[in-house]
Amino acid sequence: MAKLDIIDRSGKTAAQVDLPESVFSAANDHLIYEAVINYRANQRQGTAATKTRAFVSGGGKKPWRQKGTGRARVGSTRSPLWRKGGTVFGPQPRDYSYELPKKARRSALRSALAKKHAAQELIVTSELELKEPKTREAAALIKALKLDSALLVDLAENANLFRAVRNLPRVKAVDVAGLNIYDVLAHKSVVFSRRAFEAVLEKLS
């Protein structure tokens, strides 16, 4: 069974943790692709809307009589053929979300973490606690760990961390329940506290 170093804030190895093969096996790239597409589809607002001829203001009166004028027959000034007319087949509000099976979602997250580990971009630290919810404290932590783009993962009770990183560019903090494949892949490094990493392993095993 492979092992991963647990580092402290100075970057020194403090302990090691086992990496179960059930989680860190070969990555399934197609499943990762499907999970990312699903995540992004579920994030869409789906509020784009255009007005068809039924909803454009005006156009209730027939512009001229049907026959006898020599002009083309027209029933409404809001025909899509006319200037200021309605839109044909334009977008309408809709729900883009769809369900991906829970097994597939978990397997995709396992694959994403396996790829991060293979690229040496998976980090486990002894703890991510901050004394105060201050941006400068979070920035000091990021600097000490020599990170640039990072996803920090800890338990929900670490409220100071979540508040402190809000103003840091390229850094995001989530709790274990909020961990998703898109955030894992969108950041160069994924940093777990030891307790969060153990919780994720238990969830994915």
Model-flagged regions — what are they?
Residues R53-F89:
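Glycine/serine-rich anion-binding loops at beta->alpha junctions
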Residues T47-R53:
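Short coil/turn segments at secondary-structure boundaries
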Residues M1-Q45, G90-S205:
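Extended polybasic, low-complexity segments that bind anionic RNA or targeting/receptor surfaces
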